[in-house]
Amino acid sequence: SSTVRIHIHTNSPEQIFELVRQHGEIQQRKVEDMVHQHQEWIRSEKDRVGIVTDSTCDLPQEFLDRYNIRVIPLTLAMDKDEFVDKVTITPEEFNQRLSFSSSVRTSQPSPGAFQDAFAAALNEHDGLVSIHLSAAMSGTWQGAVAASRNSADRIRVLNSKLVSIGLGMVVLEAAKRAQKGATIDEVEEAARAAASRTRFYVGLDTLDYAVRGGRVSKGSGLL
């Protein structure tokens, strides 16, 4: 067997990973966001408070770029393959694989992923408000809290008690306030207020995928 190290600059990392998977096993992967690195040089002085969230927020990329929102991706495990959510697999590809994958799991970002994201964001901003999906659904919020302890005076971590576009609306409200020059206290309060008045309803055509992901028991899935 042989090992190959590949270094590529691309706007479509998920396509590169899919191509490489066709020729062998990926032992280690690393993806860096060059857009955010460039934005360090052009950010507004008003942008004192940065917004961080996770990849479940489901905001369109246009809004993430416009408001300089930093996203920490979760990991998706589909059968024997692992993907970095919305980085090495797109939502469209996820949906395609979902139809034939027998096992689908998500896992929270690693402690190192949180620490790296917070360190990079603190180079751009005086403080951060980090807003995440419901702590009842994932350990992501707890991971963010743990990673923020060494910079607790500069990082506020919020459990939105929401997910998907519900979380996205809270993140967007906080980002708008931050871009207007609000203080970290004001941005945090805006996020908490938005979360408290947001209600998120979901209708499912089938419980099959919820059962596969472990969110619903097999017994409940039969009802």
Label for each model-derived stretch:
Residues 1-3, 37-39, 44-48, 56-66, ...:
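Mixed-charge interfacial surface used for oligomerization/domain docking
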Residues 99-143, 188, 195:
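Glycine-rich phosphate- or other oxyanion-binding loops that anchor nucleotides, phosphorylated ligands
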